[in-house]
Design a protein with these regions (language model features):
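Active-site loop-to-helix "anion-binding N-cap" substructures in soluble metabolic enzymes
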Residues: 1-256
């Protein structure tokens, strides 16, 4: 399967931005801006915006995702949200293992794996984030590290479940910094992700996998990044908070 046959996915990660009323305005702007998209469009919002996002995107081509999910179905886990709670709202995707979760909230490769399996069991499509720090890149261990992150994240995930998994390469040094991996750097790691998935699940499964790049993708660099053969989409931070900028990236994915 070549790139043209894979599903390109542009997912906005709003992070801790937008109140419910602000979200309503942004979604109203997004709907017409991306209605002709030739790729799948996802917006991953704070929990407090999910109901608004789901209601306002009904009947449109925009899918809704959450930014995290707990690995238990229910119980005494104050402040947490389960996969069943999200799917009951109409949420389809969930971001798992974002570098900010790893940095600030003690996320580990093992908890990423637990969340991934819980998300899949609950009917969600996980967007699993992997990536290296600047120090790790300078040490030359990027590929080794990312391979390990992918292997642990997918431990216990079946080949059938893999069809609902997206993996996003997000170099930590490019998250929220304005720095971006070059298109060649992004391609190199996205290809390595596809290679390790091939070793685990076979070549056909690897060729079918959607691999995103996340890390300060914006209207200026999106087309070059998305033109690479192993970059199938983007996990977009800051640019997803402005409808016009997000739409430019969606258009670039359609071309790519």
């Amino acid at each position: 399967m070549d790139k043209a046959k894979r599903k390109a996915i542009i997912a906005g990660n709003w992070k801790m931005n937008k109140t419910a009323s602000e979200a309503a305005v942004l979604v109203d702007e997004l709907v017409p801006a991306v209605q002709d998209a030739g790729c799948e469009v996802v917006i991953c919002t704070p929990y407090t915006d999910l109901v608004t996002a789901v209601e306002k995107t009904k009947g449109t081509n925009i899918h809704v995702g959450a930014e995290n999910v707990h690995f238990e179905k229910s119980g005494a886990f104050t402040g947490e949200i389960s996969a069943d709670m999200l799917t009951d709202l109409g949420v389809e995707y969930v971001v798992i293992g974002h570098s900010e979760r790893r940095q600030y909230f003690a996320e580990t490769n093992e908890t990423v794996n637990k969340r991934t399996k819980a998300a899949l069991a609950g009917g969600l499509k996980p967007i699993i984030c992997v990536g290296e720090s600047l120090a790790q890149r300078e040490q030359g261990v990027t590929e080794e590290l990312v391979r390990m992150q992918v292997k642990i994240a997918l431990n216990g995930v079946t080949a059938d479940e893999l069809k609902n998994v997206v993996i996003a390469y997000e170099p930590i040094w490019a998250i929220g910094t304005g720095k971006t991996a070059t298109a060649d750097q992004a391609e190199e790691v996205c290809a390595a992700i596809r290679k390790v998935v091939g070793e685990l699940y076979g070549e056909n499964a690897a060729k079918a996998l959607t691999v995103q790049y996340g890390g300060s993708m914006n209207p200026k660099n999106a087309e070059e990044l998305l033109s690479k053969p192993d970059v199938d989409g983007g996990l977009i931070g800051g640019a997803s908070l402005k409808a016009d900028q997000f739409a430019v990236i969606v258009d670039a994915a359609t071309k790519g």
